């Protein structure tokens, strides 16, 4: 043996990280961006398509779209049926006509209710066989003033009861209920009278509610006058408002209830026309009775 072979060559020291096949010990995941993923860690999902969307999504998406379309169709059909049934009971589209008002109309109409004596033209204007909106015709009936007047009447009644130390929610509720009940009774009585007299008129139930509700404007004026000036102010203002509403109702309803000849000023002849005239006078005459009955106990 020679001397050189008696000594073993010192082993080569491995430098950490010198082997490119060994990953960095501080790296949590393998870097697969530079090459193919090792076959040992490859777990292909054979149930997934190429875009990475599960195969069930392709099956469920058409079903969900169909369900959404079917549900929308059912909802729209149900809404149409509900609208038809509601419109059959309560003509919402027609009621909107009675609230087509503006500030100018409200001011003029209240002035007409309080001072109707100088007004000349009482005919309702039409456009293509349809009455124009109230904001374009002061003679057209509306529901805005009656509804607001009814609510204001309840508030003024509560104020009057409060000044007399008689206010309570129960009494105010009874006041509102009685006023509404008398209004319903009045409208039903007018409808029954029109049916018995067999009057062919274009008056609708909503028109009658509007005309019957105009008296609340005079009732409010009377109660406020009573609060400010006592019983004397109440009776004076209420008497004026009663005369005004009677005049207003006669001049308005005579064009609706009486015959065309009577509406034009021709002498009323015949038993049927006499009944229509009496009916018009009765509807107008009953307004002051309700006005006094619903307000006299509020002023003391």
Curated annotation (Swiss-Prot):
Q: Which residues lie on this side of the membrane: Extracellular?
A: 164-178, 227, 300
Compartments annotated for it: namely:
Endoplasmic reticulum membrane; Golgi apparatus membrane; Endoplasmic reticulum-Golgi intermediate compartment membrane
Q: Which residues lie on this side of the membrane: Cytoplasmic?
A: 1-142, 200-205, 249-278
Q: Pfam families from the xrefs? A: YIF1
Q: What is its main location?
A: endoplasmic reticulum
Q: Which UniProt keywords apply?
A: Endoplasmic reticulum, Golgi apparatus, Membrane, Protein transport, Transmembrane, Transmembrane helix, Transport
Describe its membrane topology.
Answer: Multi-pass membrane protein
Renumbered to this chain, region (Disordered) spans 1-46
Provide a GO biological process annotation.
sperm flagellum assembly
Transmembrane segment boundaries: 143-163, 179-199, 206-226, 228-248, 279-299
This protein's GO CC annotations: COPII-coated ER to Golgi transport vesicle; endoplasmic reticulum; endoplasmic reticulum membrane; endoplasmic reticulum-Golgi intermediate compartment; endoplasmic reticulum-Golgi intermediate compartment membrane; Golgi apparatus; Golgi membrane
Function recorded in the entry: Functions in endoplasmic reticulum to Golgi vesicle-mediated transport and regulates the proper organization of the endoplasmic reticulum and the Golgi. Plays a key role in targeting to neuronal dendrites receptors such as HTR1A. Plays also a role in primary cilium and sperm flagellum assembly probably through protein transport to these compartments.
What protein family does this chain belong to?
Belongs to the YIF1 family.
The protein here is known as Protein YIF1B-B
Gene behind the chain: yif1b-b
């Amino acid at each position: 043996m020679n001397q050189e072979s008696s000594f073993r060559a010192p082993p080569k020291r491995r430098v950490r990280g010198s082997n490119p096949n060994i990953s960095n010990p501080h790296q949590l995941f393998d870097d697969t961006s530079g090459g193919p993923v090792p076959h040992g860690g490859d777990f292909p999902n054979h149930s997934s398509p190429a875009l990475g969307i599960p195969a069930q999504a392709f099956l469920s998406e058409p079903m969900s779209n169909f369900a959404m379309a079917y549900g929308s169709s059912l909802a729209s059909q149900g809404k149409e049926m509900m609208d038809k049934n509601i419109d059959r009971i309560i003509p919402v589209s027609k009621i909107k006509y009675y609230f087509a008002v503006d500030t100018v109309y409200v001011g003029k109409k209240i002035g007409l209710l309080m001072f109707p004596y100088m007004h000349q033209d009482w005919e309702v204007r039409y456009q293509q066989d349809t009455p124009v909106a109230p904001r374009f015709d002061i003679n057209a009936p509306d529901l805005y003033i009656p509804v607001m007047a009814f609510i204001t009447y309840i508030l003024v009644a509560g104020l009057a009861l409060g000044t007399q130390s008689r206010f309570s929610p129960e009494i105010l509720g009874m006041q509102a209920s009685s006023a509404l009940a008398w209004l319903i009774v009045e409208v039903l009585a007018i409808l029954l009278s029109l049916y018995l007299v067999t009057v062919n008129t274009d008056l609708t139930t909503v028109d009658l509610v509007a005309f019957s509700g105009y008296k609340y404007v005079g009732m409010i004026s009377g109660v406020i006058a009573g609060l400010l000036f006592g019983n004397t102010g109440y009776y004076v203002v209420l008497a004026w408002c009663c005369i005004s509403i009677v005049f207003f109702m006669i001049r308005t309803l005579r064009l609706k209830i009486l015959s065309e000849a009577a509406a034009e000023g021709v002498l009323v002849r015949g038993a049927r026309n006499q009944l229509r005239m009496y009916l018009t006078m009765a509807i107008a005459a009953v307004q002051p009775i309700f006005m006094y009955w619903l307000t006299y106990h509020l002023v003391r």
